Amino acid sequence: MNADPHNGDIFTLCDIVRETGFEIYKYLRSGHREKIYENALAHRLRKRGISVEQQQELRVFDEDGTLLGYLKADLLIEDRLICEIKGVRSLVDEHIAQLLGYLRASRIEHGLLINFGGPKLE
């Protein structure tokens, strides 16, 4: 894919991340710790010139502005896409809720949940 992830729409960026995740899955297959997949995805995206921050700390506030605590998203890509990595047999509702919590806390609109642990990439 030759699209520019810096200036393109979010769908182009998501396509690049999914494509890169699939390449990693074909190479590594399942069975590794999540951190291995996180590092692999961050590394390959950076090689493509895409900005990636790992274990990005997200602050959670109460409605009055009081800091309640922190969450850590696996990957923040181009400052506009949160990517949560899993290495489980299959995704469950709690995984989706976790990503949605990260999106609310960060006020970022878009997220991807990628599972490398199943018989096929999810």
Which sequence ranges carry the predicted segments?
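Short, low-complexity, charge-dense intrinsically disordered segments
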Residues: 1-9
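A short, surface-exposed helix-loop junction/capping segment
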Residues: 17-27
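Active-site metal-binding core of divalent-cation-utilizing nuclease and nuclease-like domains
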Residues: 30-80, 88-89, 119-122
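Nucleic-acid nuclease catalytic cores
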Residues: 86-122
